[in-house]
C-alpha cells in the first residue's frame, strides 16, 4: 500500500486543461491499442466528460464499471485501487464496510483522480476492461508519461 501512496504523490500535474484531458485520453488509447486491450477509457475535467472511447472487445458492462470506479475515486479523492487496498488492509472489504451502494460504487482498480500542483483534484482518468490491477497500471503508465514525457522518449 505504501507504493500506491507514493505513486499518488508523484503523479501530480502542473496543469490540466480541457485540451490536456483530451490528449491524455489519446495517450491512454494509444497504450491500450498497443496492447490490444479491450477497454473503455473515460477522462473528465471536473464533472465534464472530455474523452470517452470504447475499444474492440470491451462491452457495455465496462461503461458501468467506469462510472462505479470513478465515483469511488471522486468520493475518496484517491485512486480506486488504493481505496480497495485500504479497506483490505483493515481486514474488511469496501463492499462490506463502506456503506455505499455497490451498484453505484466499486473500489476496483482503474480510476485515478487527476491532481494539479497547488490546486488539488480537478478530474479523473478511468479505464475498465482488464483485471483491476492492469486497469490501474494502464492509467498509471499514462499519467507517468504525462508527468515526465522525456523519460519515455526514444525507447
Report residues per predicted region.
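Intrinsically disordered, low-complexity terminal regulatory regions
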Residues: 1-59
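Extended hydrophobic
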Residues: 96-144
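Short, solvent-exposed cationic patches
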Residues: 74-76, 136-155
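Short, positively charged
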Residues: 18-22, 88-96, 148-154
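Structured interaction and signal-relay segments at domain junctions
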Residues: 36-100
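Secondary-structure boundary elements
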Residues: 34-35, 117-118, 145-150
Amino acid at each position: 500500500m505504501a507504493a500506491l501512496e507514493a505513486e499518488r504523490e508523484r503523479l501530480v500535474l502542473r496543469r490540466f486543461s480541457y485540451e490536456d484531458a483530451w490528449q491524455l485520453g489519446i495517450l491512454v488509447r494509444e497504450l491500450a491499442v498497443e496492447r490490444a486491450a479491450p477497454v473503455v477509457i473515460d477522462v473528465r475535467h471536473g464533472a465534464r466528460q472530455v474523452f470517452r472511447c470504447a475499444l474492440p472487445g470491451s462491452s457495455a458492462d465496462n461503461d458501468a464499471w467506469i462510472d462505479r470506479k470513478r465515483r469511488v475515486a471522486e468520493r475518496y479523492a484517491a485512486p480506486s485501487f488504493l481505496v480497495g487496498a485500504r479497506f483490505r488492509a483493515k481486514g474488511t472489504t469496501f463492499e462490506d464496510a463502506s456503506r455505499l451502494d455497490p451498484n453505484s460504487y466499486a473500489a476496483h482498480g482503474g480510476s485515478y483522480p487527476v491532481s494539479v500542483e497547488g490546486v488539488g483534484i480537478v478530474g479523473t482518468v478511468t479505464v475498465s476492461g482488464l483485471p483491476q490491477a492492469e486497469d490501474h497500471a494502464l492509467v498509471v503508465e499514462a499519467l507517468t508519461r504525462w508527468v515526465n514525457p522525456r523519460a519515455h522518449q526514444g525507447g
